[in-house]
Amino acid sequence: MTGHRPAGGRHAAAPGRAGRRIASSPMGKLPLRARLATTIGGAAGRMSRLAGRGDGSVIGGVIGLRVEPDLLALLAAGRRVVLVTGTNGKTTTTRLITAALGELGQEVASNAFGANMEAGLTAALGQAPDAPLAVLETDEKYLPTVLAATRARVVVLLNLSRDQMDRAAEIWMVARRWREALASAANCTVVANADDPLIAWAAAAAPDVIWVAVGQRWHEDSWCCPQCGSHLSRDELGWRCGECEFTRPPARWVLDGSSVIDSAGRVHEVSLSLPGQANRSNAVIALAVSEVFGVEPAQALARLRDVASVAGRYTQVERHGRQVRLLLAKNPAGWLEAFDVLDEPPVPVLLSVNAREPDGRDTSWLWDVDYRVLRGRPVFVTGERRLDLAVRLEADQVPFELVEGVDDAVDQVSGGRLDVIANYTAFQQIRVALGRAE
């Protein structure tokens, strides 16, 4: 590991498709074809929003890339780009980093609503053509491609666990592709979670790494050493392989309960509006990234406290005289994190699960979640795969009631509050039902 460099200007030309070189004149004029692609894509996004068919954060990029296949690289040229990836926490961490970098007083381009493949990233940059900074949530599968196109200044690696296994590759294959891409990422600083063995293995190949210790609640996908395949052991000092030299790297930032020890050894209280320990972990990552850009931790923390919801997550909505709080959980690790921030029993909870393309068709992951923590409170179940979830709750002896939708659950709550946990498309459906809660 080497010491990180202050975030400065961009490096030389980035490679486009088929070997084409992309000039990196900061904020310079785009080529005519790229300007045309951006204009057409922007118009398509606006039409999508006016037609009520979403926020336009994907369609504009899809059309723009059809007109100019190198549009992502062209729009990224001249900017200092941060890429954020991992199984869980991408959208929230992206939002927190964007908030912290606001301290610099410069416009920051970002895909705030989580459209995290090439089209969504392209649309986000096209909507902020003059922003010198960009913070982009990036789908795990697309990180190598996006890194090559954007020549990112910082890459954030949060965590890796099973997620949508019928869509994405096995997580070890994902980690290997990251490792290969990062090994040749010149002038890039990687901010990585030292407590996740797969993340540590992927990041270790990078020339410049800032290790951050923010914990790992879900261990089920990382009992084997990614270096040699032997068993990993864990104790209060971290994890290590008993067969090879692979061990948890020493961290420069350490989350300890509700406090963080920064790279200079100073202690800060991590006080947030967002609930839960997982969001403290996300916040510490944001602090480490913002320091790369010259933002002091105390200044960044003040901005992080102002973030109260993220693309509908953690939003509270009044519905029929009750307070409804929305929580997103897409996989076993995410459901455990959501359980951690539930109000104490007997506050009721509504669980909603779909299995559409963005969710992954395979619902067998439901059996990897321990639902016994929900005993002692009213539990309502809805969603297109509510029967799959019902069978799982029966197995854990958790009493529940099947309902048609969020309003049915709200109407059965005597008063006060209802927590809602839903996977991706179910979450979006509930947001729409509640008036597109932000």
Question: Residues of each region from the PLM?
Answer:
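ATP-dependent carboxylate-amine ligase
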Residues: 4, 8-11, 15-58, 77, ...
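Phosphate-binding loop of NTP-binding sites
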Residues: 25-211, 223
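A short, flexible N-terminal coil/short beta segment enriched in small residues
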Residues: 71-99, 271-273, 289-292, 301, ...
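Acidic, Mg2+-coordinating active-site environments of NTP-dependent enzymes
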Residues: 79, 157, 161-322
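Fold-independent oxyanion-binding glycine-rich loops
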Residues: 87, 112-113, 137-139, 159-160, ...
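Buried hydrophobic packing segments
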Residues: 97, 101, 121-125, 283-293, ...
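Short glycine-/acidic-enriched loop or helix-start segments at secondary-structure transitions
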Residues: 120, 145-146, 166-167, 200-203, ...
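Short hydrophobic/aromatic-enriched beta-strand-loop microsegments
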Residues: 134, 154-160, 208-215, 349-351, ...
